[in-house]
Amino acid sequence: MITYEERVIKELEQWKATFMKDSSMMTRFSKKVQTKVQQLIPAKVQKVLTETIRMMVQTISAGSNFIKPKLKETNWSLQRRDDEVRKKMDEYKKIAAAEGAGTGAGGILLGLADFPLLLGIKIKFLFDAATLYGFDTSDKEERLFILHVFQLAFSSDDHRKEIWKAIETWDTEKENHMDWEKFQTEYRDYIDLAKMLQLVPIIGAPVGAYANYQLLQRLGEVTMNCYRMRLLNKD
């Protein structure tokens, strides 16, 4: 009978093979449509979104109230940590879905407000997950790792491969800086067509709830696998 850790190693191999594949032709076509839609968004709105992401990155890098007290239970098994993170992920997915439905119902003005709100929810989840896996988020290097995990979840094919290399070797070749312009560009461009449709009155509510739920699901899977890999590499 295989151990939990051995099972996770196999899951990681399968996940990596799937996750690192280039996007499908349909996905690339959707991105082209999305780019056209983004061009219709006023420059002032684009500036607000860019500034929100920049400030978030700077706040996290410098230290912020996102930081959680270090977990006292240091002897948790990987299985226990995974279970606790899954519970936390379910909590945040529900919060994100409810928030997306609420802002989506309000049309363009409230829909635009969803971008910084969802960004905050994602970052809070990442800090909680890092703490549950036993990492100290008061350490600047760990906060930079969090930003790398975020980028991995919401980046283009080429940038995703570049970020994965940094994450794989993090504990031996730590990065000490963050290109926030690349960060915000990749994140903004990743946000799919559904998030743009959230700005449309009436259909915005169900679209917003679904999109936010799926984006948190993706972030949760990426986060779990990045921290699983780090813990297993230490053993």
What residues fall within each predicted segment?
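Conserved mixed alpha/beta catalytic, RNA-binding, or beta-rich assembly cores of soluble enzyme
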Residues: L118-I123, A129
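Hydrophobic alpha-helical membrane segments of integral membrane proteins
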Residues: G111-L119
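Transmembrane alpha-helix interface/packing and boundary motifs in multi-pass membrane proteins
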Residues: E99-L112
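Terminal, membrane-proximal amphipathic helices
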Residues: M1-E99, F127-D235
